[in-house]
Design a protein with these regions (language model features):
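Alpha-helical scaffold segments in soluble metabolic enzymes
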Residues: 10, 14, 30, 111, ...
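Short alpha-helical segments that sit at the start of domains
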Residues: 1-13
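Intrinsically disordered, acidic Ser/Thr/Pro-rich low-complexity regulatory segments
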Residues: 79-225
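N-terminal helix-turn-helix
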Residues: 13-17, 21, 25-77
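Alpha-helical promoter-recognition and RNA polymerase-docking modules of transcription initiation factors
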Residues: 2, 21, 35, 220-221
Length: 225
């Protein structure tokens, strides 16, 4: 992909942030107010970002949404610049975090699903898998708009034992949260996931590609420290 200049990077980052929070296609007006630039300037920049493969316009009359390439840029950007979420982590402090028993991991997974509003998978071994938070996951806007998401993610959980068996040994080596999206994701091309190893078990945060990666990554780092 062609390298973006500083203004393009800032604009694309803001567009993705807005879309992650709202799930609404982004127009030039919202960005011009946020960046103190004219709507015309923003429109031109967004058109260029679309030509470069970072944005698409789902409908003629709508704004634009990020592509997989945009999310890859976003993930690299937040890791490089150590961008933090605005989540109130005192909400997580009330939970007692332990990793001594299977029940500790299961309880943690349920709490993470509540905090992140996503699904959590815990693989104790290749053949011992627990997951929770499907109702949280399916409450995301993607699943209300497009049945293909419901079908794809339902198939994912139907086949979760086989999928975990295929990735467990490799992903257990991860020392930092590993973020994989779209075509790079072992679960689904419609999926965003963060994988993390804690005390010999593999924890996976699973959501649509439009998931809050900053929040999920910080959450995994926080509970593991």
């Amino acid at each position: 992909m062609e390298k973006l200049d500083k203004r393009q990077q800032e604009l694309l980052y803001k567009i993705i942030e807005f879309y992650i929070k709202s799930a609404i296609p982004v127009g030039s007006k919202q960005m011009s107010e946020d960046l103190n630039l004219s709507s015309a300037t923003i429109r031109n920049e967004m058109a260029d970002l679309e030509k470069l493969g970072y944005l698409i316009q789902p409908h003629i009359s709508s704004g634009r949404i990020p592509t997989q390439n945009a999310y890859k840029f976003y993930i690299e950007f937040i890791l490089k610049n150590e961008k933090k979420s605005d989540f109130d982590w005192t909400l997580l402090d009330k939970y007692e975090v332990k990793f001594e028993t299977r029940d500790d991991f299961k309880n943690l997974a349920k709490k993470l699903a509540d905090v992140l509003e996503l699904s959590i998978i815990v693989a104790f071994s290749k053949h011992d898998v627990f997951y929770t938070g499907m109702s949280k996951l399916f409450s995301q806007p993607e699943f209300k708009k497009d049945f293909i998401y419901v079908s794809d993610f339902s198939n994912l959980f139907d086949q979760i034992d086989e999928k975990i068996e295929n990735i467990f040994d490799e992903f257990l080596k991860t020392k930092e949260p590993l973020i994989l999206i779209g075509e790079d994701n072992p679960f689904s091309k419609f999926c965003g996931s963060i994988f993390y190893q804690i005390n010999g078990s593999l924890i996976c945060v699973v959501g649509p590609i439009r998931m809050d990666y900053k929040k999920a990554r910080e959450c995994l780092n926080k509970i593991s420290n």
